[in-house]
Each structure stands twice: as structure tokens, then as C-alpha cells.
Amino acid sequence: MATYISLITETQLGETHIDESVARATRIREEAGKFGVTVTGMYWTMGEFDGVLIFDAGKDEEAAAFLHHVTSKGMVRTRTLRAFDSDSARSILQKVANKE
């Protein structure tokens, strides 16, 4: 499974309905399985981004479908990063080192 980190920004519509934010997030967590995705973390944040969503997916296509679902109501926008754990990073960097 691949890990993804999505940085969440509320839209103007999302800000208007901010009192529903926790309920929306709960619904998203419950619906994730329909897309082959497991949500492993949800955080509301201060600063440039309003929240962080961390999830695992077996394929990029599953992650993309899930994110389209998350943003489809127009409440939030996302900026998503593919994340690597230390074992994966080690493997990637060893390949780089062996190329030289």
C-alpha cells in the first residue's frame, strides 16, 4: 500500500459550513473503503492549510478517485503528496547510489 498526505484548504463554501467539518470528515473516513483506501489520520491545522488527511491506497488510481470524491462537493481543495516510509526511502536512495 502506498501512503498519501493531502493538505486540505477549505473553500469559501466550506468556510460557510465550517460547523459541519467534523461530520464531513467522519463521512469521508467511512466512505474511503469504497475506493480501496484506508484513512490513517485526519488533523485540523493552523496556518496555511486547514487540515491534513493521511491515507493508504493500493494504486494511484484508487487515491485519485478518492480525492475526486473528497473534493466533489466543493467544500475543500487538496494538494497531495506521495509519501515514503524509511524502508522505501532507503531502497530508492540505494538505487540512486548504485547508479554512480
Where are these regions (language model features)?
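Short N-terminal micro-motifs specific to bacterial/archaeal maturation
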Residues: 19, 53-54, 80
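An amphipathic, aromatic/His-enriched active-site/gating alpha helix that lines ligand/cofactor pockets
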Residues: 57-87
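Short S/T/G/P-rich N-terminal loop/turn motif that feeds into the first structured element of a domain
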Residues: 1-33, 38, 46-49, 88-100
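A short linear hydrophobic-aromatic micro-motif
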Residues: 36-43, 78-80
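Short, well-ordered beta-strand segments in beta-rich or mixed alpha/beta enzyme
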Residues: 4-9, 43-66
